[in-house]
């Protein structure tokens, strides 16, 4: 582990991978503004609405001003199930993305996302062309074990992940389950994954039933298609 004074974060070398971690990469004021921007809509108070209890139809009827949120279903064992989170995909024209049988065509960038992207690019030293947004409505929403190894991401992808809202654990484990690393991601935290990490490690955001607040995570990527 090595502190980088210029980038204000830790460079962390792990077997077959590299991480960069900056706990307060975005300050509280900017992070608060971002989450409000992402959830601003013309009908519901984003802070007091019980988002978990809305039906799919009720959710679809809400007109979000800045982000085109969607609640996808996936087919598991022949049965359709709603994803345990809300998502949105933004990117350059033609930068579509497929995962878990879900195909996403890119929404057009807006100023807020571009501003966040450019800040992270300064640290990651790469030009991102897309971002997956995951909205965890509370601690019951989660992300299963997986690896970001889709062919359109390239051989050794660099992925920049920024967290707004509730603190949630980001957990890495080696494919052979011999080693596990838990990293709490706070309001405004940046985590960058690079090197061979996606070949040797899986990651997840497990359920945390005590967490009642929402969290919005943005993972910036480079799509090669």
Residue ranges, per PLM feature:
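Non-heme Fe(II) oxygenase metal-center motifs and adjacent flexible, charged/small-residue loops
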Residues: 1-225
């Amino acid at each position: 582990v090595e502190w980088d004074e210029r980038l204000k974060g830790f460079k962390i070398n792990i077997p077959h991978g590299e991480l960069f971690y900056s706990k307060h990469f975005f300050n509280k004021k900017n992070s608060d503004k971002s989450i409000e921007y992402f959830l601003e809509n013309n009908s519901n108070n984003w802070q007091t609405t019980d988002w978990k209890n809305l039906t799919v139809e009720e959710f679809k009827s809400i007109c979000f001003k800045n982000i085109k949120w969607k609640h996808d279903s996936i087919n598991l064992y022949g049965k359709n199930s709603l994803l345990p989170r809300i998502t949105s995909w933004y990117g350059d024209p033609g930068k579509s993305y497929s995962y878990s049988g879900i195909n996403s065509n890119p929404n057009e960038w807006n100023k807020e996302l571009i501003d966040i992207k450019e800040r992270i690019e300064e640290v990651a030293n790469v030009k991102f062309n897309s971002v997956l947004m995951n909205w965890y409505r509370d601690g019951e929403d989660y992300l299963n074990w997986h690896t970001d190894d889709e062919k359109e991401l390239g051989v050794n992808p660099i992925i920049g992940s920024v967290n707004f809202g509730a603190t949630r654990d980001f957990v890495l484990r080696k494919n052979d389950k011999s080693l596990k690393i838990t990293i709490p991601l706070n309001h405004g935290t940046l985590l960058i994954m690079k090197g061979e990490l996606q070949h040797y490690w899986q990651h997840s955001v497990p359920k945390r039933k005590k967490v009642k607040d929402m969290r919005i995570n943005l993972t910036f990527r480079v799509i090669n298609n």
